[in-house]
Amino acid sequence: MTLIDNQNQTMHQALINALSTSDQIDIQVGYFYFSGFELMAQHLKDKKVRILVGKQIDPNAVPNIIAMQQKTGKPVDLERFQSWDTYVSRTEQKTKYFEGFAKLFNETQVFDNPESQQAYKIFEEKIIDGSLQIKLTNSDEHGKMYLIYNKPEMNQGGDFPGTMFLGSSNFTYNGLIDQGELNSSTRDKSDFMEAKNKFEYK
């Protein structure tokens, strides 16, 4: 087991290392923001990517998020803007999630530089061709898990299906590189397959 704390090694770099022999990544996180995809875009453009998100931000909080981002010049921790309305159906919560996600895309100035514009182009192309899927989990979830699948020629006859990361990092700039986190990684086959099965039924 290897520990990743964003100090001696960042989660960003650990994911890049594991993706070098991969053709697919499954991500389950509490929060996903474009800042996370932008960091990883060049390493994900030829991969199948599935993202499960367990929490949604309140769409009404978007102006406050934008104001805070403009003030600090850095991506914002979205957890404080979580929607706490638990009396609506999960279907309505999913609608709210994508409404809030779209508002952040449309109203923040995240595409003001060539790197962001290129990352967004990759994001858009992957959504269109189906190699990027984003879904809200069926129930409220806060766990963080990254499953990186080895290519067939790299999985040693199925004995080494991939690398699993578990811990605290959301798929955001803060979670991958900027703030203290604690994640562990393992290549154990039984642990990986158990996590894969859990991901499929979320």
Regions from the language model: what does each represent?
Residues 1-202:
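PLD/PLD-like phosphodiesterase catalytic module centered on the HKD motif
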